[in-house]
Amino acid sequence: MSYVLTETSAGYALLKASDKKIYKSSSLIMDLDSSEKVLKEFKIAAFSKFNSAANALEEASAIIEGKVSPQLEKLLDEIKKEKKATLIVSETKLANAINKLGLNFNVVSDAVTLDIYRAVKEYLPDLLPGMSDSDLSKMSLGLAHSIGRHKLKFSADKVDVMIIQAIALLDDLDKEVNTYSMRCKEWYGWHFPELAKIVTDSVAYARLILTMGVRSKAAETDMSEILPEEIEERVKAAAEVSMGTEITDVDLINIRALADQIVEFAAYREQLSNYLSSRMKAIAPNLTQLVGELVGARLIAHAGSLISLAKSPASTIQILGAEKALFRALKTKHDTPKYGLLYHASLVGQASGRNKGKIARVLAAKAAVALRYDALAEDRDDSGDIGLEVRAKVENRLSQIEGRDLRTTPKVVREAKKVEMTEARAYNADADTAAAADSDDEDEETEEKADKKRKRDTEEEEEEEETESKKSKKEKKEKKEKKDKKEKKEKKEKKDKKEKKEKKEKKEKKSKK
């Protein structure tokens, strides 16, 4: 007998098929193309109803994960007594899990069974008595919403999303501030062109416009909160002899509005930077200590998550962010890049040009260690001591390569593990006689060892001489062969030239006759 296990939003349904080998039928689509044919073929054998929405969510999650719940196992116990029974299941994972239960029936889950499930799902309200199409659709919608909420709920794995979004927004803010600052300098530059050369900081430039307004008010404006005293004097002196044009009040209002936007963006950027720093110290403290907040956040954002970055090998971490250069190098068979996002780390920046690749490789290896501890350690210490330890090792390596002391990280002092004190054993005076008696034997053994070492050294020297002589003979032989080949080639070329010349002379003679 064949049974079809159907998972609905209302519960588990076990349908009994009239055809024992329906799953082997070649005309399955034609046999189940109408409601009458499906009702004639399948009859409900058992139904296990879900008690609540929470129960439905729990059972649906178990099916997605390929697990057999106690409720489903209880339902399957009803058909295990039948001999030569076949159970048709839609999910392969679930079929494997049912097989492991050791029930007395054959479990089938392949491409053919999908046609059966398509027909059953289409005419499901007709197969389940007391269930209308609208009831099932409402239950399905509620279960779908529950599964969606269950998948999107807050978890420890999703915390790194905050870092990914924060670093992306930080980059966008930098672009916006730079664009707005450039536009503001060009706009206000018509009125006071000398100011852009004196005040190079964009935020200070915008704050000065908000405070001062037109250049004629520069002399009476207090700029001490924005600029140092020397630069303030230069601004006031330049305002008196400026070559800029006059602007109207409407122009100034619009310029000030833009300057206000720049100041607000800069303040929010600083706040966002502090937030990112605190999140990085909480989620990846050791990586933060090693490469810094910004580089660490960019690595996590590029990999997609902290877990996927922690699973990456050191070689991948080293060139993360330089994928275009890597594939171009592989395509053109040139040297592959030595670093990607790690180039912006302070440790790589301290190295000279020829040593940057070496330090990037060392830093990537230590970053992999720090990442795995941050992402996978069970009892994690958020102090970042491991990050400081590996940073000190990278600095030591950098100092060795560069030939100068570049160490800035202090040594991490950890509490020593407690050692149990035990009583020392008493000195055995009787052992002195045995030691004295064995002294002659020890001298003989040392002499034998020295002789063996001398013999070994002489044998190694002889072997080296033999290999060198063999190499020289081989080189001479190769040179001789090359010389013979060259001579043969030259002889052949001379012979060919001679034959060509003779043929040419014969042709000329014939033409004269």
From Swiss-Prot:
Keywords: Nucleus, Ribonucleoprotein, Ribosome biogenesis, rRNA processing. Pfam families: Nop, NOP5NT. Belongs to the NOP5/NOP56 family. It comes from Candida glabrata (strain ATCC 2001 / BCRC 20586 / JCM 3761 / NBRC 0622 / NRRL Y-65 / CBS 138) (Yeast). This is Nucleolar protein 58. It is found in: Nucleus, Nucleolus. InterPro entries: Nop56/Nop58 (IPR045056), NOP58/56_N (IPR012974), Nop_C (IPR042239), Nop_dom (IPR002687), Nop_dom_sf (IPR036070), NOSIC (IPR012976). SMART domains: NOSIC.
